[in-house]
Design a protein with these regions (language model features):
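Bacterial N-terminal signal peptides that target proteins for export
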Residues: 2-11
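Bacterial N-terminal signal peptides
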Residues: 11-20
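N-terminal secretory targeting modules
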Residues: 295-325
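Structural signature of tandem-repeat unit edges
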Residues: 8, 201-206, 217-234, 244-257, ...
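Membrane-embedded segments
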Residues: 327-412
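Secreted/periplasmic serine-hydrolase-like ester/acetyl group-modifying domain
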Residues: 399-517
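Secondary-structure capping and domain/repeat boundary segments
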Residues: 24-73, 77-194, 298
Length: 528
């Protein structure tokens, strides 16, 4: 019977084509179509139950466990896939949707080649006895995103504040999850800060959590503990730190809410928070006129990796690497991403490097320009081509930050710490909006790169961005002159009052000119 079936296979296949049948198996009254799916074995991973038999058209799920330092890239399955990575960094849940044929699926995995060694430096390894943990990275960005750390090390009575290239903290510092320049033999040491004594806090227990109602200490530096009296600290109530003389405050992981006026009229100069903080507003820091620096440590998986917002930090990496070289920096919103041909500029001006810093026009330009200016020097050129339908943002009139500001900082929060908060408004309100926006978003990882996707989030075979930061995927001409978002576009003088837009733009440009940086101003590039 088996031999007969083999001989008749070609004939049966022809009959199926004629009949217009499809599927995995021959359907009859006794048996439904079945598909046999096998995940092939390979280096760097193990699949639990790799062979499955399912009904045609249904989904099938697998659990893939990665070896140390290996990364899951995807599969060669041509249908829709759903990939979920667990927090341990090794477990991958893979779902193949609507499987219609029997086939063998190849897993694409890659071993990282950029090693960073993390030293507990007084802490304890959560998953082993060694004081050091080695992690290898793929190097999908010019600089490497460091570990978020809290999944590696712990230390009773201390908060992990960041990493440093020296154990005593005198080397180069980098925040948890933020980027650092890689070099052979790189070791990053955990930096710990002791919790401020419990006696300095007045708190009450609410629904199993500690709520801080007052601070009665006099320290210049306060590290608010993750727990008090054995209860996790969740909330800091209004007026709790009002009028204090402290200059530095660290809000440990697990604190989810800071109420209005919590630090009112304090002498606070710098604040450390973690990106599990959900609710905080500028009212919490009313009359804190000396608050200048906000450090954000990442302990949550990123949501905007691979998004166009994520390109800001990739472009910023390039800008940092060219800090000491002559360069032309292009700036505006997405029109700059789409519209410039930086390779032509590079060819026309061989003495200059070219960096395309355009990302998104509908977010305030001021903080972006300030970060750009910090990487430029005398003789460099800024070519600004603002988009007029976002004039209040593009001409630096709007000082209020928004969720998109933080979306651009997500893959390197350290960049935000270089901004002077006193130059902006609604900083913490914007951070809360950002947290709300990404609350229900799919979480990814820092290895995901925007150049692997097009503008709509579809995977591409060739990089969608070139080395300069230009978006290079073909874009057809517009079919309409109607502006997006319904915003008016007015190119007349009356639309740009001098005391608002023009003076604001000139004030920012003057900072560049004072550093010997040439500033050129033009219309934004556009297609037909």
């Amino acid at each position: 019977m088996r031999k007969r079936k083999l001989k008749m296979a070609s004939g049966i296949f022809l009959l199926l084509l004629i009949a217009g049948l499809s599927g995995c198996g021959q359907k009859n009254t006794e048996k439904e179509n079945l598909c046999h799916i096998v995940l092939e074995a390979g280096e760097g991973y193990h699949v639990t139950d790799p062979a499955r038999t399912i009904k045609s058209g249904s989904d099938v799920s697998f659990t893939v466990t990665l070896d140390d330092n290996w990364q899951f890239l995807g599969t060669n399955y041509h249908g829709e896939t759903e990939i979920t990575k667990e927090d341990d960094g090794k477990t991958v849940n893979l779902v193949l949707h609507e499987v219609n044929y029997s086939e063998s699926i190849c897993i694409q995995a890659e071993k990282g080649k950029y090693e960073i060694v993390y030293d507990a430096n007084g802490g304890q390894n959560i998953s082993g006895d060694s004081d050091r943990v080695s992690i290898c990275y793929r190097g999908t960005h010019q600089r490497i995103n460091t570990s978020t750390g809290t999944d590696l090390f712990a230390r009773d009575g201390y908060t992990l504040l960041g990493w440093n290239t020296r154990a005593d903290g005198t080397g180069q510092a980098v925040g948890l999850g933020s980027r650092t320049e890689w070099k052979e033999g790189l070791v990053l040491y955990a930096q710990w800060i002791p919790w401020t004594g419990e006696a300095d806090f007045v708190y009450k227990k609410v629904s199993g959590f500690a709520v801080i109602t007052s601070y009665i200490g006099k320290a210049q530096q306060i590290c608010v503990p993750s727990s008090l009296g054995g209860f996790p600290v969740r909330t800091i109530r209004e007026q709790a730190f009002a009028d204090t003389e402290c200059k530095t405050v660290i809000l440990s992981p697990g604190i989810h809410e800071v109420e209005k006026w919590a630090f009112r009229n304090s002498r606070l100069e710098q604040l450390y928070i973690y990106d599990d903080l959900e609710k905080i507003s500028d009212y919490a820091f009313q009359d804190c006129d000396m608050l200048r620096t906000l450090h954000i440590n990442s302990i949550e998986a990123p949501a905007y990796s691979g998004d166009y917002f994520d390109t800001f930090q990739d472009k910023y990496d390039r800008l940092l690497s060219l800090k000491d070289k002559k360069k032309i920096v292009l700036f505006s919103g997405s029109s700059t991403r789409f519209g410039y041909d930086s390779a032509m500029l590079d060819q026309a001006f061989p003495d200059y490097e070219v960096v395309n810093m355009g990302v998104f026009a509908y977010s305030p330009a001021l903080p972006q320009l300030e970060l750009i200016r910090s990487c430029m020097k005398e003789g460099d050129i800024l070519l600004d081509s603002p988009e007029f339908d976002a004039a209040n943002r593009q001409f630096c009139y709007q000082k209020e930050l928004d969720y998109a500001t933080f979306a651009m900082m997500e893959s390197n929060y350290d960049a935000f710490a270089d901004l002077d908060l006193r130059e902006y408004a609604q900083v913490f309100t914007a951070f809360s909006a950002y947290q709300t926006a990404r609350q229900d978003m799919e979480r990814k990882n820092y290895d995901v790169c925007a150049s692997d996707y097009d503008e709509d989030g579809n995977e591409v075979e060739e990089p969608s961005y070139n080395e300069y930061g230009d978006y290079v995927v073909y874009r057809p001409n517009s079919t309409s002159e109607k502006p997006i978002y319904g915003l008016p576009v007015n190119y007349t003088v009356n639309a740009f009052p001098k005391e608002t837009y023009i003076d604001s733009a000139n004030a920012e440009f003057q900072k560049f000119l004072d550093q010997g940086i040439k500033v050129y101003f033009t219309y934004s590039p556009r297609n037909k």
